Amino acid sequence: MRGKAVSRFLSIVVLLSATSWPGSVAAECLQYGVVNLTGRLVQQTYPGPPDYESVTKGDEPRVIWILQLDRGVCVTGAASSYPSAYSEREIQLVLGTDQYARAAQYAPYRHLVGKRISVTGRLLAGGARYEKRFVIAPNEIKRARTRP
C-alpha cells in the first residue's frame, strides 16, 4: 500500500513539473522581433565625452529614453549570441539613428515623458552601443490607458 502512495506521489510531481517548468516560462518570454510593450516613459542621464565618468565633473550629459515596464519580462534569444534575461524591467527606446533624446525624432513624443505608454516595435539586443541590455525601435508610440 505504501509503495502505491509513493508511486502516485512521484507521478504527480513528474506531471506537475513537466507542465509548469520550463514550458510556462518559455511561453511567457519575449522573442527578438516585433513586440508590444506597456510601461512608463522616463528619461535617464548618462555621462558622455570627454571622460564618460561624471556629468557633475563636466562630462556632457547624454539623455536616453527608457520604457519602465509594468512588470518584469523574460527575453530569450534564438541564438546564443543574443542575450537572454529574466525579469527585465527597462528597455531603451531608440528613435531613428540617434539613441539620445536630443534628436528631432523625439520631439513629437516629449509630452509623453512621465506617462504610461504603449510601444509597438522591434526588440533588439542593446550591445555595447547602447546603455541598456535591450532596445526597442518603435513603429508606434501612443498613450496607454490607465491601469484599472
Which residues does each PLM region occupy?
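Short boundary/loop segments of OB/S1/cold-shock single-stranded nucleic-acid-binding domains
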Residues: 25-33
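Bacterial N-terminal signal peptides that target proteins for export
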Residues: 1-11
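Structural detector for short beta-strands of small beta-barrel domains
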Residues: 32-63, 68-75, 121
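OB-fold/S1-family single-stranded nucleic acid-binding modules
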Residues: 69, 126-148
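Short, structured beta-strand/loop micro-motifs enriched in basic residues and often containing a Trp
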Residues: 94-102
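Acidic Ser/Thr/Pro-rich low-complexity disordered segments
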Residues: 72-91
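Short nucleic-acid-contacting surface segments enriched for D/E, G, S/T with interspersed K/R
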Residues: 101-119
